Protein backbone atom coordinates (compact mmCIF):
# COMPACT_ATOMS: atom_id res chain seq x y z
CA UNK A 1 0.00 0.00 0.00
CA UNK A 2 1.03 3.60 -0.52
CA UNK A 3 2.45 5.65 2.33
CA UNK A 4 0.40 8.85 2.49
CA UNK A 5 0.57 11.96 4.63
CA UNK A 6 -2.19 14.43 3.78
CA UNK A 7 -3.99 17.58 4.78
CA UNK A 8 -7.69 17.26 3.96
CA UNK A 9 -10.24 19.98 3.31
CA UNK A 10 -13.23 17.78 4.08
CA UNK A 11 -16.57 19.19 2.95
CA UNK A 12 -18.74 16.21 3.92
CA UNK A 13 -18.68 14.73 7.43
CA UNK A 14 -18.50 10.93 7.44
CA UNK A 15 -18.93 10.30 11.15
CA UNK A 16 -18.81 6.53 10.60
CA UNK A 17 -15.10 6.83 9.78
CA UNK A 18 -14.26 9.18 12.63
CA UNK A 19 -15.04 12.56 11.06
CA UNK A 20 -16.44 15.25 13.34
CA UNK A 21 -20.04 16.05 12.39
CA UNK A 22 -19.13 19.25 10.55
CA UNK A 23 -16.95 20.40 7.66
CA UNK A 24 -13.32 20.39 8.77
CA UNK A 25 -9.68 20.42 7.85
CA UNK A 26 -7.63 17.51 9.09
CA UNK A 27 -4.16 16.02 9.16
CA UNK A 28 -4.00 12.41 7.99
CA UNK A 29 -1.06 10.09 8.66
CA UNK A 30 -1.37 6.83 6.68
CA UNK A 31 -5.15 6.76 7.28
CA UNK A 32 -8.32 8.62 6.31
CA UNK A 33 -9.02 8.87 10.05
CA UNK A 34 -7.50 12.26 10.84
CA UNK A 35 -5.03 12.65 13.71
CA UNK A 36 -6.16 16.25 14.26
CA UNK A 37 -9.10 18.25 12.93
CA UNK A 38 -10.57 21.71 13.23
CA UNK A 39 -13.92 23.11 12.12
CA UNK A 40 -13.96 24.78 8.72
CA UNK A 41 -16.78 26.22 6.66
CA UNK A 42 -16.55 25.95 2.90
CA UNK A 43 -17.78 29.08 1.09
CA UNK A 44 -19.57 28.04 -2.07
CA UNK A 45 -18.15 29.60 -5.23
CA UNK A 46 -15.47 31.64 -3.44
CA UNK A 47 -11.72 31.29 -3.91
CA UNK A 48 -9.96 30.06 -0.78
CA UNK A 49 -6.30 29.60 0.08
CA UNK A 50 -4.67 26.66 1.84
CA UNK A 51 -1.15 26.87 3.23
CA UNK A 52 0.66 23.81 4.59
CA UNK A 53 4.06 23.81 6.28
CA UNK A 54 6.43 21.41 8.00
CA UNK A 55 9.67 21.89 9.87
CA UNK A 56 11.80 18.94 10.99
CA UNK A 57 13.20 20.81 14.00
CA UNK A 58 9.78 21.51 15.49
CA UNK A 59 8.49 18.24 13.96
CA UNK A 60 5.16 19.93 13.37
CA UNK A 61 2.87 19.74 10.35
CA UNK A 62 0.51 22.73 10.16
CA UNK A 63 -2.20 23.97 7.84
CA UNK A 64 -4.23 27.15 7.58
CA UNK A 65 -7.22 27.58 5.26
CA UNK A 66 -8.81 30.95 4.68
CA UNK A 67 -11.11 33.02 2.48
CA UNK A 68 -10.55 36.74 1.79
CA UNK A 69 -12.10 38.84 4.53
CA UNK A 70 -13.12 35.75 6.46
CA UNK A 71 -11.76 33.94 9.44
CA UNK A 72 -9.18 31.22 8.95
CA UNK A 73 -9.11 27.64 10.20
CA UNK A 74 -5.83 26.25 11.55
CA UNK A 75 -4.79 22.73 12.42
CA UNK A 76 -1.44 21.26 13.42
CA UNK A 77 -0.04 17.92 14.50
CA UNK A 78 3.35 16.98 15.93
CA UNK A 79 4.90 14.26 13.82
CA UNK A 80 8.37 13.18 12.70
CA UNK A 81 7.91 12.59 8.99
CA UNK A 82 11.36 10.92 8.80
CA UNK A 83 9.79 7.93 10.52
CA UNK A 84 6.82 7.78 8.14
CA UNK A 85 7.77 8.84 4.64
CA UNK A 86 10.44 7.42 2.36
CA UNK A 87 13.38 9.74 1.61
CA UNK A 88 12.05 10.46 -1.87
CA UNK A 89 8.39 11.29 -2.38
CA UNK A 90 6.00 12.99 -4.76
CA UNK A 91 3.64 15.77 -3.74
CA UNK A 92 0.14 16.10 -5.10
CA UNK A 93 -3.43 17.31 -4.86
CA UNK A 94 -6.36 14.91 -4.72
CA UNK A 95 -10.15 15.25 -4.66
CA UNK A 96 -13.30 13.20 -4.93
CA UNK A 97 -17.07 13.35 -5.18
CA UNK A 98 -19.62 10.73 -4.18
CA UNK A 99 -23.39 10.76 -4.52
CA UNK A 100 -23.12 14.40 -3.48
CA UNK A 101 -20.78 16.49 -5.55
CA UNK A 102 -18.83 19.72 -5.94
CA UNK A 103 -16.28 21.27 -8.24
CA UNK A 104 -12.74 20.70 -6.97
CA UNK A 105 -11.01 23.44 -8.91
CA UNK A 106 -7.38 24.42 -8.29
CA UNK A 107 -6.39 27.88 -9.56
CA UNK A 108 -2.77 27.96 -8.39
CA UNK A 109 -0.28 25.76 -6.56
CA UNK A 110 3.22 26.35 -5.25
CA UNK A 111 5.65 24.25 -3.25
CA UNK A 112 9.11 24.72 -1.77
CA UNK A 113 11.21 22.14 0.05
CA UNK A 114 14.60 22.66 1.63
CA UNK A 115 17.03 20.09 2.93
CA UNK A 116 20.08 21.34 4.83
CA UNK A 117 22.81 18.87 5.74
CA UNK A 118 25.80 19.36 8.03
CA UNK A 119 27.92 20.50 5.12
CA UNK A 120 26.86 24.10 4.56
CA UNK A 121 27.38 23.83 0.82
CA UNK A 122 25.11 20.85 0.52
CA UNK A 123 21.60 22.24 0.61
CA UNK A 124 18.99 20.77 -1.66
CA UNK A 125 15.82 22.54 -2.57
CA UNK A 126 12.93 22.15 -4.94
CA UNK A 127 10.54 24.91 -5.86
CA UNK A 128 7.65 25.10 -8.28
CA UNK A 129 4.80 27.52 -8.90
CA UNK A 130 1.74 27.14 -11.10
CA UNK A 131 -0.19 30.39 -11.44
CA UNK A 132 -2.17 28.68 -14.15
CA UNK A 133 -2.17 25.22 -15.67
CA UNK A 134 -1.46 24.50 -19.32
CA UNK A 135 -3.78 22.34 -21.42
CA UNK A 136 -1.33 19.44 -21.62
CA UNK A 137 0.94 19.95 -18.62
CA UNK A 138 4.29 18.20 -19.00
CA UNK A 139 5.27 18.79 -15.38
CA UNK A 140 2.18 17.19 -13.82
CA UNK A 141 1.13 13.57 -13.54
CA UNK A 142 -2.66 13.57 -13.88
CA UNK A 143 -4.47 10.54 -12.46
CA UNK A 144 -8.11 9.46 -12.63
CA UNK A 145 -10.49 12.22 -13.73
CA UNK A 146 -8.08 15.13 -13.20
CA UNK A 147 -7.71 17.48 -16.17
CA UNK A 148 -6.77 21.04 -17.01
CA UNK A 149 -9.31 23.33 -18.66
CA UNK A 150 -9.18 26.14 -21.21
CA UNK A 151 -9.32 28.72 -18.38
CA UNK A 152 -5.97 27.52 -17.04
CA UNK A 153 -7.49 25.78 -14.03
CA UNK A 154 -6.87 22.27 -12.74
CA UNK A 155 -10.12 20.32 -12.32
CA UNK A 156 -9.37 17.45 -9.96
CA UNK A 157 -12.80 15.86 -10.47
CA UNK A 158 -15.05 15.66 -13.50
CA UNK A 159 -17.01 18.72 -14.61
CA UNK A 160 -19.47 18.60 -17.49
CA UNK A 161 -20.76 21.90 -18.95
CA UNK A 162 -19.76 23.64 -15.74
CA UNK A 163 -21.57 21.14 -13.50
CA UNK A 164 -19.70 18.83 -11.11
CA UNK A 165 -20.27 15.11 -11.60
CA UNK A 166 -20.94 12.43 -8.99
CA UNK A 167 -18.58 9.56 -8.18
CA UNK A 168 -15.44 11.15 -9.58
CA UNK A 169 -11.90 10.97 -8.26
CA UNK A 170 -8.73 12.58 -9.57
CA UNK A 171 -5.23 13.56 -8.55
CA UNK A 172 -2.37 15.69 -9.86
CA UNK A 173 1.23 15.06 -8.76
CA UNK A 174 4.30 17.12 -9.53
CA UNK A 175 6.44 15.11 -11.95
CA UNK A 176 9.76 15.53 -10.09
CA UNK A 177 10.37 13.50 -6.93
CA UNK A 178 11.18 15.51 -3.81
CA UNK A 179 14.02 14.60 -1.44
CA UNK A 180 11.99 15.24 1.68
CA UNK A 181 14.44 14.01 4.31
CA UNK A 182 17.92 12.60 4.66
CA UNK A 183 19.53 10.93 7.67
CA UNK A 184 22.33 13.51 7.65
CA UNK A 185 19.98 16.47 7.31
CA UNK A 186 19.98 19.16 9.96
CA UNK A 187 16.74 20.70 8.77
CA UNK A 188 14.16 19.45 6.33
CA UNK A 189 11.24 21.75 5.70
CA UNK A 190 8.55 22.39 3.14
CA UNK A 191 5.78 24.85 2.38
CA UNK A 192 2.86 24.36 0.03
CA UNK A 193 0.12 26.79 -0.97
CA UNK A 194 -2.83 26.29 -3.27
CA UNK A 195 -5.92 28.31 -4.13
CA UNK A 196 -9.16 26.46 -4.73
CA UNK A 197 -12.79 26.96 -5.65
CA UNK A 198 -15.49 24.58 -4.45
CA UNK A 199 -18.98 25.05 -5.89
CA UNK A 200 -21.90 22.70 -5.52
CA UNK A 201 -25.51 22.51 -6.70
CA UNK A 202 -26.21 20.31 -3.65
CA UNK A 203 -27.00 21.60 -0.19
CA UNK A 204 -24.37 19.11 0.98
CA UNK A 205 -21.22 19.39 -1.16
CA UNK A 206 -18.83 16.43 -1.17
CA UNK A 207 -16.28 15.19 -0.64
CA UNK A 208 -13.22 17.41 -0.45
CA UNK A 209 -9.69 18.25 -1.57
CA UNK A 210 -6.38 17.13 -0.07
CA UNK A 211 -2.72 18.05 -0.38
CA UNK A 212 -0.72 14.87 -0.03
CA UNK A 213 2.80 13.46 0.07
CA UNK A 214 3.34 9.87 -1.06
CA UNK A 215 5.84 7.30 -2.28
CA UNK A 216 6.97 8.23 -5.80
CA UNK A 217 5.00 5.46 -7.56
CA UNK A 218 1.72 6.27 -5.79
CA UNK A 219 -1.50 5.82 -7.75
CA UNK A 220 -5.21 6.14 -6.96
CA UNK A 221 -6.13 3.13 -4.81
CA UNK A 222 -9.00 0.97 -6.03
CA UNK A 223 -12.26 1.98 -4.35
CA UNK A 224 -10.84 5.20 -2.88
CA UNK A 225 -13.52 7.57 -4.18
CA UNK A 226 -16.06 9.49 -2.11
CA UNK A 227 -15.11 9.80 1.55
CA UNK A 228 -11.64 8.30 0.96
CA UNK A 229 -10.61 11.35 -1.16
CA UNK A 230 -8.64 9.30 -3.70
CA UNK A 231 -5.98 8.59 -1.08
CA UNK A 232 -6.73 5.41 0.83
CA UNK A 233 -8.08 1.97 -0.17
CA UNK A 234 -10.20 1.64 2.97
CA UNK A 235 -11.35 3.48 6.09
CA UNK A 236 -8.96 1.80 8.56
Swiss-Prot record:
Mn(2+) binds at residues 8, 10, 19, 24. A carbohydrate binds at residues 14, 99-100, 207, 227. Concanavalin A-like lectins of the Diocleinae subtribe undergo proteolytic processing referred to as circular permutation. The propeptide is split into an N-terminal and a C-terminal part, the gamma and beta chain, respectively. These are then religated in beta-gamma order to form the mature alpha chain. The beta and gamma chains can often be detected in cell extracts. Residues 1-118 of the mature chain, as displayed here, probably constitute the beta chain in the propeptide, residues 119-236 the gamma chain. InterPro entries: ConA-like_dom_sf (IPR013320), Lectin_LegA_CS (IPR000985), Lectin_legB_Mn/Ca_BS (IPR019825), Legume_lectin_dom (IPR001220), Leguminous_Lectin (IPR050258). It holds the Pfam family Lectin_legB. Ca(2+) binds at residues 10, 12, 14, 19. Keywords: Calcium, Lectin, Manganese, Mannose-binding, Metal-binding. The keyword Manganese applies. One of its GO terms (molecular function) is manganese ion binding. Binds one manganese (or another transition metal) ion and one calcium ion. The metal ions are essential for the saccharide-binding and cell-agglutinating activities. D-mannose/D-glucose-binding lectin that also binds derivative alpha-methyl-D-mannppyranoside. Has hemagglutinating activity towards rabbit erythrocytes. Homotetramer; dimer of dimers. PANTHER family: CONCANAVALIN A-LIKE LECTIN FAMILY PROTEIN, LEGUME LECTIN DOMAIN-CONTAINING PROTEIN. Belongs to the leguminous lectin family. This is Lectin CPL. It comes from Bionia pedicellata (Camptosema pedicellatum). The lineage of its organism: Eukaryota, Viridiplantae, Streptophyta, Embryophyta, Tracheophyta.
Amino acid sequence: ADTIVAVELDTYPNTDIGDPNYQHIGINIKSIRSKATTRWNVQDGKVGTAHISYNSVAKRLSAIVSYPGGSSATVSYDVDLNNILPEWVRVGLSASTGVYKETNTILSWSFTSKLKTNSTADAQSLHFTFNQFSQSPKDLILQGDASTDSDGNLQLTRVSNGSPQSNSVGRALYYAPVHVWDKSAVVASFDATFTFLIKSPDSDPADGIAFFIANTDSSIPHGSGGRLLGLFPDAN
